[in-house]
Amino acid sequence: MEEKLNYWMIVAGGGGKVWSLFKEENIACIDFDSNLSSILDYKNPQELNQGKQRDKFIWKFAHDIKKDDYIIATTGVKEILGIGQCVKPYYFDESKKTFKHCIGVKWLKVDGGWEYQGKKGVRQTINWDRNKERINLYESILNGTYRKNIEKVVMNKNINDYLDI
């Protein structure tokens, strides 16, 4: 049986400040200003000791994003910057000063400018998106049929059904 691909929204730094890093290095990465080593060295999320919500974000990033899953890079709650597919599962890049927690990504669309409305009041670092209408929207971006005025309505609909992790 073929494994279902998932769609993960990952903020490219507040306001997209590390989007250029994502594109240049073909990665998506997260950083919580902590001294955590590789997440794979920990037995459970509680051992991370970064706070309950952060523990879940970091743990899911390292353990649940799988090869071929779709990665939607965003600015936070307003714009999709790019869409790609995971080509390398979680790894820890000790050579970086920040944003050491990484996954390899083949960026398929990097034009940006696709509007959406994220879930207000919730940290948007990582979300597993299960909304079929938004997934259809991501697919329209990938296949070149995205239409801003029509698709914007879809992105604003049912914004509360992200799976917050």
Say what each PLM segment does.
Residues 36-113:
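Structured alpha/beta reader/binder surfaces that contact nucleic acids or chromatin modification marks
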Residues 20, 60-63, 88, 148, ...:
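Charged/polar, solvent-exposed surface patches and flexible loops
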Residues 19-23, 95-96, 114-120:
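Short conserved micro-motifs at the rims of enzyme active sites and ligand-binding pockets
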Residues 1-60, 161-164:
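Compositionally biased, charged N-terminal/linker segments
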Residues 27-32, 90-94, 103-104, 122-129:
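Short, low-complexity, polar/charged sequence segments that are solvent-exposed and flexible
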Residues 3-6, 112, 116-165:
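ATP-dependent helicase/translocase motor core
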Residues 15, 86, 106, 115, ...:
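Compositionally biased, intrinsically disordered low-complexity regions
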